């Protein structure tokens, strides 16, 4: 019988005999790498959730230049009025009971409501009592932020009753003081848009402006 000598491949050769076939065992040869698809991460929306007068409100917020800003309102609750001002640093919220709150992007809430008005004779007029006594009375209406520290709103104060004239009042946010612009007296007042001169106001059909300092100009 003829002797048969078999060659055994070493690990370095990475080859072996299988039956009569010489097989290359280097897995890297002929293999195909499958690239994983790149999935772009969609930034998740972020919200600031607050409660005003037992009503939840969600503000959509964003980060810009390392600063948190209010971008929009997810949904304005029924009979609420919301004005986002001050370049998104805060929002002014008027609830159905005519309370005014400033909501800051940080989550802080500041109530700047005029809870009562004290007349020249010292008599005290309480907001909720007046509103219950005179249906449709305007204590606070359509507040608009005219600067970082001031808010303008429309009111019937300082008079009480029915069929009253309207006035523009200014809130100083820091001191929470309210002051009337007497020259704004009118049957109808409508706040329009902000521009270079300030807040555009239609007063009985006449165009005026409220400056960032709270002054009424032509």
Specify the residue positions occupied by each region the protein language model found.
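Surface-exposed loop and turn segments in beta-propeller and other repeat-based domains
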Residues: 53-72, 109-134, 185
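Short beta-strand elements that form the blades of beta-propeller/WD-repeat-like
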Residues: 40, 49, 83-95, 101, ...
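Structural motif
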Residues: 97-103, 156-157, 161-171, 206-217
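N-terminal, intrinsically disordered, polar/charged segments of Gram-positive cell-envelope systems
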Residues: 1-73
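Extracytoplasmic beta-rich ectodomain segments of secreted or membrane-anchored proteins
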Residues: 63-112
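Intrinsically disordered, low-complexity segments enriched in Gly and acidic/Ser/Thr residues
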Residues: 138-187
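Acidic, small-residue rich beta-repeat scaffolds with periodic aromatic anchors
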Residues: 4-27, 171-218
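Repeated scaffold domains used in trafficking and secretory/extracellular systems
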Residues: 77-83, 138-142, 185-196
